[in-house]
Amino acid sequence: MTICALGLMAKAPLEGEVKTRLVPPLTAREAAALNICFLRDMAANIERISETESASGLVVYTPAGSESAFAGVLPEGFSFLAQRGASLGERLCNATDELLRQGYGAVCLINSDSPTLPRSILIRALHSLAKDGDRVVLGAAEDGGYYLIGLKHAHRNLFNEIAWSTSDVLARTRQRAAEIELPVELLPPWYDVDDAGTLARLCEELLFMSPLDGAYPAPHTRAFLETIVKSEGRQRICPNHD
C-alpha cells in the first residue's frame, strides 16, 4: 500500500519566535499559545484523516534539536523531520526528497497557519496523488502563495528562482511546472492566519458566524480566542465585527 506523508511545516512554538506578525494585537506569549493551538488542531485533523486514508502525519520542524518544544502538542503517532536549507524552497524540496527516500509514495507539505483548513481538501490532495501519473498538487492561498504542495517526485526546479513570501509564489510555481511539463492540480483557495486582519477574520468565523462550508472547527483555536473575548471583549482581536 502506498502511503502519503502529511507533513506540517512548523517552527518550534517558542515565545517571541512564532507568529510575530500577530504582535500586536496579541502579546508574544499569546501568539506562541495560539501557535500551539493551530498545531494541535491541524495535527488532530491530519490524524483523523490517517485513520481512514493511506496517510501518515508528521511535523517538519525548525530549528533542529527543538523536538521537546512540541511535547504534548502533537499526537503520539506523529514523527519528526528537521528542516534543512536556507530558503523556504530548499526546505520544502529537501523535506520532500527525504520523505520519499524514507519510502513514502507521495508527500504533502502543509503550512501550519490554516487551522480551519477543510478535511475534504486534504483528502482531495491524497486522492489526486494516488492516481497514476506524475503531478504537483497545490493548495492556492488567498495571498498568492500556497498552503499545500503535494508531490510524488522531488522536482527541484519547482522551487528555483521563487521570491518566497510574495504574492507571486503560486503563479511562479505554476510557471515552473509548465516549464518541466508537470501537470498541476489546484485545490480550492484557503487563507493563512499571519497578521491582525486574518486573525480578526478567523475570530469572527469561529465565534460569531456560521462555519464556512466544510471548514474544520479548530476546537483548540476556538477555545483560545473565546477565552480572550469573554475576558475583555472582542475589540482587541476582532475589531471588525459589528
Predicted region positions:
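Conserved donor-nucleotide/metal-binding helix-loop-beta segment in metal-dependent transferases, i.e.
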Residues: L117-D143
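N-terminal nucleotide-binding beta1-loop-alpha1 segment
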Residues: M1-R21
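A short, N-terminal amphipathic alpha-helix
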Residues: N35-E53
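Short, glycine-/small-residue-rich phosphate/pyrophosphate-handling segment
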Residues: R156-R174
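Short beta-strand/loop segment that forms part of the nucleotide-sugar
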Residues: S54-P63
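Short phosphate-binding loop-to-helix
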Residues: A69-A106
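Short aromatic-hydrophobic micro-motifs that form the base-stacking/packing surface
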Residues: C108-I110
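Conserved alpha/beta core of the MobA/IspD/sugar-nucleotide pyrophosphorylase nucleotidyltransferase superfamily
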Residues: Q175-D242
